[in-house]
Amino acid sequence: MPTLVVLAVLLAGLVVFANVWTDVQWYSQLKAAKVFWTQWGWAIALGTLGTLLVGLSAFVNHIVARTGEKTAVRKGIDQYRQQIEAHPWLARLFVPLALGIVFGAQLGSQWRTYVLWLHRTPFGQKDAEFGNDVSFYVFTLPVLQSLLALSVTLLAVGAVVAIVSHYLYGGISSDGSKVVLTSRVRVHFGVLGALAALVVAGFLWLRRYNMLLANNEKFSGASFTDINASLPGITILSLAAVLIAGLFVLAAVKGLWKFTVIGIAVTAVAGLVVTTAIPYFVQRFQVVPNAAEKESTFIQRNINATLAAYGLDNVKKSEYKAQTDAAAGQLRSDAETTAQLRVLDPNIISPTFTQLQRNRPYYSFDQQLSVDRYTIKGTPRDTVISVRELNLNGLSEGQRTWVNDHTVYTHGFGVVSAYGNTTTSDGEPSFFQQGIPSTGELGKYEPRVYFGKSSPDYSVVGAPKGTTPWELDYPTGGSKNGVKSTTYAGDGGPKIGNAFSKLMFAIKFRDTDLFFSDRVTKDSQILYDRDPRVRVSKVAPYLTLDSRVYPAVVDMDGNPKTPKRLVWILDGYTTTNQYPYSARQSLNEATADAKSKGAGQYGESPEQVNYIRNSVKAVVDAYDGSVKLYQWDKKDPIVNAWSKVFPGTLTPMSKMSGDLMSHMRYPEDMFKVQRTLLSRYHVTNAKEFYSGGDFWDVPQEPTAPKGSTQDQPPYYLTLQMPGQDKAQFSLSTGFILGGADKQNVMTGFLAVDSEAGSEPGKVRNGYGQLRLIELPRDVTVPGPGQAENNFLTDSKVSTTLNLLKQGGTQVIMGNLLTLPIGGGLLYVQPVYVQASKTSGSTSYPIAQYVLTTFGKGSKIGFAPTLEESLNQTFGGDSGAQAGDANVSGHKEAPSADSNKQQAESESQCFAEPERLSFGFA
């Protein structure tokens, strides 16, 4: 049995060593070893310190008790004392060390708290009550709380050891009717009591500051009752606890325990009065009858702090007197916006990309494609883009061997991108970059995708020079076996060429084939942790990552002679929940909508935050997996502190190429959090805020299934907001009336300038500017839900769509876009049709119609193109040209006379392929 235990311990140690050693290799390959060693160095150092302090507390209290008076021999007790004396190392070393490990080592898990405090930087903003810089609450207060919690552990462990030791050595005894303590024991306990009282005083003193971080029913931060009733009482109690500490010392020296007991009793009763009774009466009889007036000062503090903490203190607000009548030529001044109006829905057309561009079953595209912009032939264009990633699930069961999974099928290939504002005449995406090999308007770039969101868990790549390539590169008709092979030539993973490395990685992945396979050569590398989010979160463990990762083909070095790179771009946030008076918000709740499908943030983040900054833009190369962290926010004190903790890991934004800069955008999750807060905090008057009468809601997704309460997602598109000089790539959302009734009436519209510019190392002026337009209360402007209802209840639209459905065709309503143009609000929605799923894998959605409406009294536009639909809505001529103006559909737009006949024709058109497909099957 002992042999088995030893073997088990050795095996466990080997596994731990293998995991640590391989992690070191991974970080070293990324030139980020300092991140690994800094994390573990601080964690081990603090864990060791906590262990030693707790162990020392146990040791000192035992020694103090041991040197006390010894009583006469007590049957049944002295035998234990004799055992301890016979093995002094047990009590003096082993027990304290064991207690230290159990209760003290956890201090290592708080390494972030301590390193941030050591490298803290000021916020330059003071709290409204005590005048402390915000950095005190973010960096210092957590350390003080941690130290007090550690003190409680030290005293608790010390007290338990003291009681046990005094009992064993006779300092504590019983004569049958009462417990007898020697004078030395009373002194010992008096000192411990004094220290405990000081710790309580410390907790009470810090509680004063924690009031500013509290959540109240109506707002966050300290309230009138907190400041005027609870705060004075807690301050008095804290001072009283210091006096009690003095009484404990007096009792220890003079033996006057009566005064100590009286002091504790009086303080306990006073504590109930000043922390419970007085605040209750103040709240009930002073605040409740006059709440708006009494709380206004504190609500205003909450409003100001929340706007500052969430980057909402510079929102440009304006009133927008929206028209509801549409007239010919009304969009003439908005031609730039309508030209880029997106009719391709990135959340619907993934199956279309898959059917038309996948090429082989072992490739796949993301379920939600990305919206970006590229300059094509000198013209900026909104685009929809996705990466053709490797998907091993597309292989047959017979193809799923270790060799294939880990050495042959190693990477995806290229991007596919289509114009966002137009389609082909058949309703399919109009691709400008496509195919294998990748061809199109993006120029020459490295198309191989070794690092992506769906890459295999690990691949072994690389081979000696002259070896026949065995990695499948891409399918081609020009070779004997129909594929072109390649050998990885990058530096993307740790070397795995020698026996020791193979053994370590075989243990890590629990895979013996890694050790024995001949495909693992002296020139091999192992690629793992290939998801861009995983790589960034390991290199920057302090960041919360946006739920969206998007690809871009970018000139990284600014040299047009070198090939571009395919990269993944991620937005990183620094957050805290320690900003005084700022409202707390759950990131997962604020960012959940109909598009997120449960995807949340990745990385380090508290459950709720009350401060957030998009401090870092991360870029991961899809070929070699290299990670670059660009410091996007130079003023954020939290990221500045982390840059001192991990020096050299952040790249100044000034080193970003112009082409990469042009693909930076305002982060989606940040915007969602801000819109959630602005639904309430657009009200900046404290008394109006208290009433809540003008609070808004985010509209629910109008295309979601009945009964769903999912929020409508914000959308990236090019638009010109009222007061803006020209149309810019933006992220936008609407607001509707708040309250339990959920009236779908538009009350506001928020957009943020998401155009970072294309100047190397410099963000364009205007990027990140939030613009909020508020609609007049005396005009009823339909919200997204009303607009969707108007579309579906229009006789022409409903007849056509119902007939299509009867013919076996699935009708899919695309994203409902809202645009404040033409002096009102324009709604645009593409309509997709898809053959029934019973027709097999050839079923995919194509854009068939575009719906438009402007105000509650306007005509519904319903046509194969946006151009025609806008003209229908605006009296035959909208005055502007849409991006699909030159597209002619393969059937005419439905008219009042031909609507039924047209729909029946389309129904047959889609039903027949279904029958043919079934027949051939």
Regions found by a protein language model. Name each.
Residues 3-920:
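Soluble extracytoplasmic regions of secretory-pathway and membrane proteins
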